[in-house]
Amino acid sequence: MQRAYESSSFSRLAGRALACAALGVGLAGCPPAPPASQFPTADDALGRMHACYDCALGVQGTAKVDLVAQQGRVKGDVYLFAVAPDRVRFDVVSPFGATIYTLTSDGRDFKLADQEQKTFFYGPATPCNLARFTQVPVPGHALVSLLRGEAPVLVHTREAASIRWDGGHYLLDLPSTRDAEEEIQIGVHPDDFDKPWQEQRVRVLGVKVVQQGIPLYEAELSDHKPVTTAPPRIDEEGIDDPVPPSGPECTAEIPHSIRFVVEHTEDDVLFQYKDGEAKWNPPLIEGTFTQPVPGGMRRQFTDCDRAP
C-alpha cells in the first residue's frame, strides 16, 4: 500500500512537471498541484481549520496599522487584545508616541476614546460601532476570528457548501441561510501536502462576504508563522500573585499580515504583527476590555444600527 501511494504521488508530480515544461512557463508558472489526500467536503476543511486553532483562545500583540479611509489616513502602532468570542482592545499610538485612540469592547459595551476629537464614544458593541476604528463592518466575533487567523463562518447547510482546488489553494463557497454568501480561501501547510487530509494543517488566506448582493468586506491573510503562548503576568513589586495565561500551551500559526478592504467605501486597513510580539492566550486582568472616561473629554452615545 505504501509503495502504491508513493508511485501515485510520483506520477502526479511528474505529470505536473511535464505539463509546466510543455507550456514553457518556467519554474514559477504552474500553481501547486492539489494534495494527494483532499478534503471531501467544505465542512471537512472548516473542521480542520477549527482544529488548528482549538488551542488559540485569544491573541495579544503589537502591530503596525495603516488605515486609509474617507476621513483620511492613520498610521501608527496598535497594541491589541482579541479574545474569543468577541472581546477586543486596541490602543493606537502615533509614530511620535502619543495615544490616538483606545477602543474596548467586552462583547456587549463599546467604548472609544478619541484623543484627536476629545470625544468619548460609547454604546452597544455593534458592527458599525466597531467600524468607527476598524472601518470594517463586522461583528466582534468575526473580527476576533480574523485577528487570530481563523475565518468567521456564516450559518449554512452542509449540502449547499462547496469546495474546489483553485490555483494553489482551496476555494470554499458558503451560501448562507440568511441572505448572504461567503467565500473562503484555505491553503495547506507546505509540509503537509503528502499527509492524509485529517492531519493537514491549514491556513486561511482570504475571506469575502457579500450581504444581499453587496460586498460587505474582504480580508487577505498572509505571512503565516507559528507563535507561542504568552508567559504569566508577574507583579514587579511582588504584591499580587502572577496572572496565568488565559488558555493552554499553543504553537498555532498566525498571519502576520491581515488586510481588510471594504469595496463600496474604499476603506482599507492593514495590520502587520511585529515579529516576536504576537502571543497566544495572554494573561487577562480585570478591566482589559473596558475603560473609564478620560478627563476633559465630552461623552457621546452612539448606536448607529438603530433606526432614528
Model-inferred region functions:
Residues 1-30:
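Sec-dependent bacterial lipoprotein signal peptides
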Residues 29-77, 243, 302-308:
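N-terminal leader/targeting segments and the immediate start of mature chains
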Residues 56-60, 75-77, 83-87, 98, ...:
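Extracytoplasmic
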Residues 62, 73-79, 85, 215-218, ...:
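Beta-strand-dominated lipid-handling architectures at cellular/organellar boundaries
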Residues 65, 84-86, 92-96, 107-109, ...:
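A mature extracytoplasmic/lumenal domain signature
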Residues 86-142, 271:
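An acidic-aromatic
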Residues 149-153:
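Scaffold/interface architecture of coatomer-like assemblies
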Residues 160-307:
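Gly/Pro-enriched, hydrophobic low-complexity segments
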